[in-house]
Structure formats: C-alpha cells, structure tokens
C-alpha cells in the first residue's frame, strides 16, 4: 500500500510544548513509523515539509500525498490541553467522519498504542475542520501519541520510546507484527558509524537539504540540530550554500549530494589545520595554480578544514566573511594537526 506519512508542525510553525516538545518528539516517532512500514513492504511517501509557516506546512503535506496518489494519510502529533497535568490523559486518533476505512485504521492504531504501551485509550474522535482530514481524498488519520503536559503520559512515552510507538502504529496498519530485517550483528551500526567517522561538520540549527544552491529549491528532507554531516571536497565559491551528504535514518543510507546553508549560525565546520608563516594573507584559489584567480584569503593563525593535499596544494573549507567556502591553498603554509 502507498502510505503518506507526515510529522506534524515544524520548527518554524511549532506544535505543543509541555514537559516534552511536540515537534521534536513527533519527528522521532514518524521516522520510526516510516522505518517499520518500509520493513513491512509498504511504499511510504514522506510528506513532511521543511521549515515554513503553518498554512504552507499543512498545504504542502497534503498536496504531496495527493500528487503521489497515496492510499492512506497518517499524520503524527502530540496533544496538549493544560499548562501541566498530574496524571494520565492518554492517546487518541482523529478522523473526518465515521463509516469509512479511516475509522477502521484509526481504531486499530489507538487500540494497539494503548495495549502496547499502557497509555489511556481515548478512542477515535471526529473533526471535520482539521485541514489534514478535510483536504485529503484518501483515508486520513491524525494520531495524537499522548499529551505533552501529562506527567503519566510523558513517563510512559519516555519509558517505551519513540521507536516502539512508531512500530505499534505500523503494526496496526499492517495487522501483524513487524520484525526488523535480520542482518549480521552490528552491520547497520557499522554503516552509520563509518559515515559518522567521515563527517566534518555539525548542524547547529535545523537545515533543509536542497536540490540546488538557491532560495528556490525542492526540500529533500530534514537535518536536525546536532546532527553530523559531511561537507564535500569540491570547490565552492558560494558563501550562502555548501554541498554536503547526510545520513538518512529512515532508509539507513547516505544521502545523495544536497545543498545546505553555509552561514556560520547554521554550521560548525571541524578544523584540522592552521595557517602558518604568512606575512599578509594566503590566497584561496579556484585551481591548483599560482595563475588561478583569487576566491578570497585567510590570514596567519586562522583555522580551516583540509580535505586533501595534492601537488603542493591543500583543498580546504574556510570561513569567508559570513559563510563557508572551499578552495585550494598553497600547502606549505598549512600545518595539519
């Protein structure tokens, strides 16, 4: 079955905030849901938009589901009713109206979540005003995992974890237990570990992976604050964007080349080298030649990340004014750590 899955809200149009943050937690749950639906053999479409206002967020999510002719739409949320609540409020699902496939899926989901976690079962409720339910042509279910401010809900959620929540939702759709693919012990971890060892940059804010280095782009996913990525070893004279690769948890593979913001308030590039013995400045060049035109420069004592050294030149990513660039530098003026 072709299933559209959406993580509710985004970090620009944030969701509920209580003991836990809805936007942060539903990103964990929806990724787990996608993982288990994929394992079960479903064709899963991630319809979670990037950072945008609430109306755009809702529109893009539904439109992508429609454009892909999805057969089921699932949206993951966390609820909130009070500033703080001592006790349990529970898990529930919302549908547009009674009597269709959406109600069947919604009941299976809420029952399985409650049974599998111990969360109070709030049942299936109707709401014909919610955008995701009234604008979708396929059966649609909005899942409220639990209440952000309810102490017992949060205790259970933290104890059980987002991976189990995603698994229980997927198994409710699948109508049978889903087992993770059996692979040699440690194989998947080693793939990710190998990638992480090759990274050279930390995201210090949430990033949109773009298909091109401009403000008009296709959003290819989500890179969250704190994630490690790899800036690619290629010449880049665009202080607004850098070419990178990131790890896609939902499919457990490296991404293809994408572009992200190169601004210093979005990225923190690792450094492994220092500029030395420079009297004035060291030119950043487009090619490995003294005849190359000048991209920019670095000064004595500046730090940068060197990707490789070839023919007496070091390819390095450096901070240029208000964004990072990658260029060739005369290697004898670069001291590796």
Curated annotation (Swiss-Prot):
Gene3D superfamilies (alphabetical): Zn-dependent exopeptidases
Q: Which residues form the MurNAc-LAA domain?
A: 3-174
Q: Which InterPro entries match?
A: MurNAc-LAA_cat, N-acetylmuramoyl_amidase_3
Q: Which GO terms describe its cellular component?
A: outer membrane-bounded periplasmic space
Task: Tell me the Gene Ontology biological-process terms attached to this UniProt entry.
Answer: peptidoglycan catabolic process
Q: Name one GO molecular function term.
A: N-acetylmuramoyl-L-alanine amidase activity
* Entry similarity comment: To C.perfringens pIP404 ORF10.
Q: What is this protein called?
A: Uncharacterized protein CPE1502
């Amino acid at each position: 079955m072709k299933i559209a899955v959406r993580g509710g809200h985004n970090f620009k149009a944030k969701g509920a905030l209580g003991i836990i943050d809805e936007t942060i937690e539903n990103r964990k749950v929806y990724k787990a849901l996608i993982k288990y639906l994929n394992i079960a053999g479903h064709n899963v479409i991630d319809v979670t938009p990037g950072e945008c206002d609430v109306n755009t967020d809702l529109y893009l999510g539904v439109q992508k589901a429609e454009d892909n002719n999805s057969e089921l739409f699932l949206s993951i949320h966390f609820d909130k009713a009070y500033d703080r609540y001592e006790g349990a409020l529970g898990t529930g699902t919302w549908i547009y109206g009674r009597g269709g496939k959406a109600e069947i899926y919604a009941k299976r989901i809420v029952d399985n979540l409650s049974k599998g976690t111990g969360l109070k079962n709030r049942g299936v409720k109707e709401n014909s005003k919610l955008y995701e339910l009234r604008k979708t042509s396929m059966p649609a279910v909005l899942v409220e995992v639990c209440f952000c401010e309810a102490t017992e809900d949060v205790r259970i959620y933290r104890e059980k974890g987002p991976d189990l929540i995603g698994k229980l939702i997927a198994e409710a759709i699948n109508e049978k237990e889903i087992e993770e693919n059996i692979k040699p012990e440690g194989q998947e971890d080693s793939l990710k570990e190998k990638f992480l060892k090759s990274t050279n940059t930390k995201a210090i804010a949430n990033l949109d992976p773009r298909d091109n280095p401009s403000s008009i782009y296709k959003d290819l996913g989500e890179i969250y604050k704190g994630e490690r990525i790899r800036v690619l070893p290629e010449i880049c004279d665009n202080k607004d964007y850098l070419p990178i690769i990131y790890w896609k948890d939902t499919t457990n593979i490296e991404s293809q080349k994408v572009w992200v913001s190169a601004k210093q308030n979005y990225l923190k590039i690792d450094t492994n080298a220092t500029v030395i013995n420079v009297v004035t400045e060291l030119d950043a060049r487009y090619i490995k030649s003294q005849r190359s035109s000048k991209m920019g420069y670095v000064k004595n004592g500046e730090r940068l990340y060197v990707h490789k050294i070839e023919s007496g030149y070091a390819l390095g990513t450096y901070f240029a004014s208000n964004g990072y660039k990658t260029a060739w530098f005369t290697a004898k003026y670069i001291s590796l750590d």
